[in-house]
Amino acid sequence: MQKQRFCLDTTAITDSDVRRSLGVSNISESAEKIMDIIAQARVQLDISCHIPYNTVYKELVGFLIREECAPETLIKVDTWLVKKTPNRYEIKIPAEIFYEYIKDLRERINKGMRISENAMYETALEAYILSKPDEKDREDVLNEVLSKTVNSFRDKYRNTLRGGTLDSAPDLDVLLLAKELDAAVVANDEGIEKWAQRLGLRFVNARDFPFILQEYLDLWDKK
């Protein structure tokens, strides 16, 4: 049987879907549960779980510290997750992938520009409508309109430019390290999933990951 390797994104430990699937209410509990399962899988089955260093590792540890996770959990992260920097100079990526990424990025930028233009038109129209009936104070009109429009703009702009694509160095490092190690990617991120598929990498949704490891362990115990 081929040695099983997994490459973890931060969401593999911290995502809310993971907590719900494990039936726990906070990140401290879910992180500890996941790390215990990872430790058992390593000791009993030689299944290794890797994390890109220092991008994803730093992101994960920072998140756990902010959530006031127990020091013991952080020690487990250091002990059972294999920290490795992707060999960015040696990993070969097909040129077609870069072409698709640039094309996708260009389309998103154009959509973002159209959203910006629409937001400006909506702001001007709302300001005109609000100021016309009773000639409201200029600052009140601007504050009322801008707060509403800016919030709407941020949501639309973020979803258009960042949803379903790689938007950070840690995201890219997860894919590069997984490709280098021939490991399955573990994440709950639409962009990582999409580009993992394009790179021909195995993908495991973060909420399913603990149960997959547990299934391996249960089968081993039955032997």
Curated annotation (Swiss-Prot):
EC number(s) from the headed UniProt entry: 3.1.26.5
Coiled coil: none
Family membership noted in the UniProt record: Belongs to the HARP family.
Any GO BP: tRNA 5'-leader removal
Gene Ontology molecular functions: ribonuclease P activity
EC class: hydrolase
Catalytic activity: Endonucleolytic cleavage of RNA, removing 5'-extranucleotides from tRNA precursor
Gene source species: Methanococcus maripaludis (strain C7 / ATCC BAA-1331)
Function noted in UniProt: RNA-free RNase P that catalyzes the removal of the 5'-leader sequence from pre-tRNA to produce the mature 5'-terminus.
Disulfide cross-links: none
Keywords assigned by UniProt, alphabetized: Endonuclease, Hydrolase, Nuclease, tRNA processing
Protein's name in the database: RNA-free ribonuclease P
